[in-house]
Amino acid sequence: AATTFQKPLSVSYAMQRAMRTMSSPGRGGYAAARAAEETAFRCRSLAAELFGVPSPEQVVFTSNATHALNIAIRSLVPEGGRVAVSGYEHNAVTRPLHALGARIKVAASPLFDRAALLRAFENSISPELDAVVCTHVSNVFGFVLPIEEIAALCRAERVPLIVDASQSAGI
């Protein structure tokens, strides 16, 4: 995660190598640009495989998770739109929703009670929502939300789901 201190030495080496040997992916036919483009595509392919995305071309890299969440939220939620969230959301979710003037419905439940949280989402999700935005794992508590079940509720009501997987990607 971006907030972790002391990245593994392999990360430092990979970044140094990239800065020495790569440049401008997709922007030229010279060796450094081709190397960067091939590396980016390999990364997209691995990410697509990890997350079950049908095609590497559907994988987008952003500066960080906050940027990605802003893109997703601002793409699906209009100004004044209706959204359901859990009570575990990070500021990267709540701030853009408030900036949009979204009408936010919190699926409130006692802390760490997955069954109660799922019931709260059952009562909160309806077709008039523009989206449900939900973390998978709380960055504060480490609580794992029942994301598969929440996703099923969203599918049943045909409501888009934005998942903040910052703390759980790959597990």
Question: What is each PLM-predicted segment?
Answer:
Residues A1-I171:
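Pyridoxal 5′-phosphate
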